[in-house]
C-alpha cells in the first residue's frame, strides 16, 4: 500500500481536524446569541437537501469501512447487499412516522418526549436510559474504529487521534449545540459523497480482478448465514434507529413533511449506494488477491488490504474521508446526548453548561473503553438486541386503537424480551453462562449455528409475550381494586377526544412557546 509518510499522515489528519475546528467555532460565533431552545433543537427550520446530507452524515461513521467489508468477506454478495439495504431503508421510517409523532408531540424534539406524553415519566426514563446507553456505545465504537483505521492506514498510534477528535468535537458542539452539528454535518456529508466517488474511480482504474478467484471465493452463492441475516439485520437496525436521537432531532427540524420525505428518500438512495460500494471493497479485495493475504488477516481489514494496490494519493483521500466520517458521526452523538439528557433528565430547566460538563466527563470513560473495545460490529449488535426487545412494544402506542396500552407493559415487555433471550440461550446451549454470553452476542452473527438468529427472534417475540402478560396482570389488579373500592373500572375506557382547538393538522413552524403536555398514564 502506498502508505503516506509519518509527516504526511500527521499533516493530513490534524489539518483536517483543524479545518473542522475552525469551521465549527466560526459557526458557533455567529450563533452566539441563540437562545437555549435553539441550542438543543432546531424544530421546523430545515429544508430537504440539508436534511438529506445530515441523515447521510449521521448514519455513517468510520466504522463502515470495517463492518461492511467484513460482512462481505463472511457472507458474500448476498449478506453484503442485505446489510446495505437493511441500513439504508430504515431512514424511510422517519419520513413515515415522523409526521405522526410531530403532530402528537409538536413541542418535542426527541422520541422520549413523545414517550413521556404517551406512556408516562417512568417509561420515558426507561427509554432515555436505553437511548443514552446506545449513544454511549456508539461513541465507543466510533472512537475505537477511528483509532484502528488510522493505525492501519498510517501506522500511527490511534490514541492521540482519538483524543484530538474528542477535543475538537467537544469544543464546537459545546459552543453551538445542535445547530453546529447540523451545519458541520451538511459540509461533511457533501465531502464524504465526493470522496467516495473519487475512491471508487481509483479502485476501478487500479485494481485488477482475477476471474479464477471469483468462482473460488463462493461469494456469488447464497449461504445459511446470509439467509439468517435477511431477518436479523432489518430487525436489528430498524429498531435500533429509534434509539438514535440524532435522527429524531433532524426529523423534528424539517420545515415541512414534504421536506422530511424528500430528505430521507435522497438519504436512503445515497446511503444504499455508498454502503454497497464500501461493502463491495471486501469482495474486490478477495477477488483481486489482496485479501486474506499471508498470513491470513481478519475480514475487518479487507478494505485496507485493497489499498495496498492503490497509489499514495488515494490513501490520503481515504484518510480525509475517514476523519470526516468519524467527526460527523461523533459530533452527532454528542449533540444528541446533550439534547436527550437535557430534555429527559432535567426537563430543559437546568443550566445548559451543566449538561455540557456532563458530556465532557463522559468522554473520559468513552476513550478508556474504546482503547480496549472489542469488535465494532459486536458493540452494534449488543445495542441492536436491546432495541429489538423494546421498540416493537413501544410502537403500539402510535395507533389510537391501542389507547389501553400503558407504560407498564412497555417496560415489562422490554425487560422480558432480554430475559427471553437469556432463557433461549440457556436452553439452546445448555448453559446459563452461554445464555448470558448470547446477550452480549459474543459469538457474533457468523458462528454457524442458530444462536444469534434465535436471539433476535426471542427478543421481540418475548417482549410481546411479557407485555401482554403484564397487561393481563394490570387489568386484573385494576378490576379487582375497582370492585373492592366501588370505583368504576375505567382501564379500557377510550380517552376523551381532544377539542378542535387542541388538534394540530400540520406541524407548526411558528416561534410561539408551546406548553408541554403532562405525562401519560404508566399504570
What are the language-model segments listed below?
Residues 2-66, 173-179, 195, 505-506:
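Membrane-interface "cap" regions at the ends of multi-pass membrane proteins
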Residues 27-32, 136-143, 147-152, 156-164, ...:
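Hydrophobic alpha-helical segments and their helix-loop junctions in multi-pass secondary transporters
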Residues 31-35, 429-523:
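Terminal cytosolic tails of multi-pass membrane transporters
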Residues 40-107, 247-292, 305-325:
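Membrane-interface helix-loop-helix modules in multi-pass membrane proteins
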Residues 81-173, 236-237, 322-332, 351-352:
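Helix-loop-helix module between adjacent transmembrane segments
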Residues 108-116, 177-186, 243-276, 291-302, ...:
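Hydrophobic, small-residue-rich membrane helices and short re-entrant helix-turn-helix hairpins
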Residues 118-125, 136, 332, 339-378, ...:
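Loop-to-transmembrane helix boundary motifs in multi-pass membrane proteins
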Residues 129-140, 191-202, 229-242, 257-289, ...:
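Selective recognition of specific alpha-helical transmembrane segments in multi-pass small-molecule
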Amino acid at each position: 500500500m502506498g502508505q503516506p509518510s509519518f509527516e504526511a499522515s500527521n499533516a493530513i489528519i490534524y489539518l483536517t481536524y483543524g479545518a473542522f475546528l475552525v469551521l465549527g467555532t466560526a459557526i458557533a460565533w455567529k450563533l452566539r446569541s441563540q437562545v437555549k431552545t435553539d441550542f438543543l433543537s432546531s424544530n421546523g427550520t430545515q429544508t430537504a437537501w440539508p436534511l438529506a446530507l445530515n441523515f447521510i452524515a449521521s448514519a455513517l461513521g468510520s466504522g463502515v469501512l470495517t463492518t461492511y467489508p467484513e460482512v462481505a468477506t463472511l457472507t458474500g454478495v448476498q449478506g453484503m447487499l442485505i446489510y446495505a439495504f437493511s441500513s439504508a431503508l430504515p431512514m424511510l421510517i422517519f419520513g413515515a412516522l415522523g409526521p405522526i409523532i410531530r403532530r402528537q408531540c409538536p413541542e418535542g424534539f426527541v422520541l422520549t418526549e413523545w414517550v413521556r406524553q404517551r406512556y408516562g415519566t417512568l417509561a420515558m426514563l426507561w427509554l432515555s436510559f436505553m437511548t443514552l446507553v446506545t449513544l454511549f456505545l456508539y461513541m465507543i465504537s466510533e472512537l475505537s474504529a477511528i483509532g484502528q483505521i488510522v493505525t492501519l492506514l498510517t501506522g500511527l498510534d490511534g490514541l492521540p487521534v482519538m483524543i484530538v477528535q474528542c477535543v475538537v468535537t467537544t469544543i464546537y458542539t459545546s459552543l453551538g449545540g445542535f445547530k453546529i452539528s447540523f451545519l458541520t454535518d451538511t459540509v461533511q456529508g457533501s465531502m464524504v459523497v465526493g470522496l467516495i466517488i473519487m475512491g471508487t474511480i481509483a479502485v476501478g482504474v487500479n485494481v485488477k480482478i482475477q476471474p479464477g478467484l471469483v468462482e473460488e471465493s463462493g461469494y456469488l452463492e447464497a449461504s445459511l448465514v446470509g439467509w439468517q441475516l435477511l431477518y436479523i439485520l432489518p430487525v436489528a437496525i430498524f429498531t435500533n434507529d429509534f434509539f438514535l436521537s440524532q435522527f429524531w432531532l433532524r426529523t423534528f427540524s424539517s420545515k415541512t413533511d414534504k421536506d422530511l420525505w424528500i430528505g430521507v428518500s435522497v438519504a436512503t438512495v445515497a446511503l444504499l449506494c455508498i454502503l454497497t460500494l464500501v461493502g463491495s471493497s471486501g469482495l474486490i479485495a478477495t477477488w483481486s488477491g489482496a485479501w486474506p493475504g499471508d498470513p491470513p488477516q481478519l475480514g475487518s481489514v479487507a478494505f485496507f488490504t485493497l489499498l495496498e494496490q492503490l497509489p499514495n494519493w488515494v490513501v490520503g483521500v481515504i484518510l480525509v474521508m475517514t476523519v470526516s466520517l468519524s467527526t460527523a458521526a461523533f459530533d452527532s452523538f454528542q449533540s444528541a446526548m446533550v439534547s436527550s439528557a437535557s430534555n429527559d433528565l432535567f426537563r430543559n430547566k437546568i443550566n445548559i453548561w451543566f449538561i455540557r460538563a456532563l458530556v465532557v466527563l463522559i468522554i473520559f470513560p468513552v476513550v478508556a473503553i474504546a482503547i480496549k473495545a472489542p469488535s465494532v460490529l459486536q458493540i452494534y449488535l449488543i445495542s441492536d438486541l436491546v432495541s429489538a426487545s423494546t421498540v416493537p412494544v413501544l410502537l403500539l402506542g402510535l395507533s389510537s386503537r391501542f389507547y389501553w396500552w400503558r407504560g407498564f407493559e412497555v417496560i415489562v415487555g422490554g425487560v422480558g424480551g432480554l430475559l427471553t433471550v437469556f432463557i433461549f440461550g440457556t436452553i439452546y446451549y445448555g448453559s446459563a453462562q452461554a445464555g448470558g454470553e448470547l446477550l452480549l452476542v459474543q459469538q457474533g452473527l457468523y458462528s454457524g449455528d442458530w444462536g444469534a438468529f434465535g436471539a433476535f427472534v426471542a427478543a421481540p417475540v418475548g417482549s410481546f409475550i411479557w407485555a401482554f402478560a403484564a397487561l393481563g396482570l394490570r387489568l386484573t389488579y385494576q378490576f379487582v381494586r375497582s370492585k373492592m373500592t366501588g370505583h368504576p373500572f375505567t382501564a379500557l375506557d377510550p380517552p376523551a377526544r381532544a377539542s378542535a382547538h387542541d388538534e394540530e393538522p400540520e406541524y407548526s413552524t411558528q416561534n410561539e412557546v408551546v406548553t408541554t403536555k403532562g405525562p401519560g398514564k404508566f399504570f
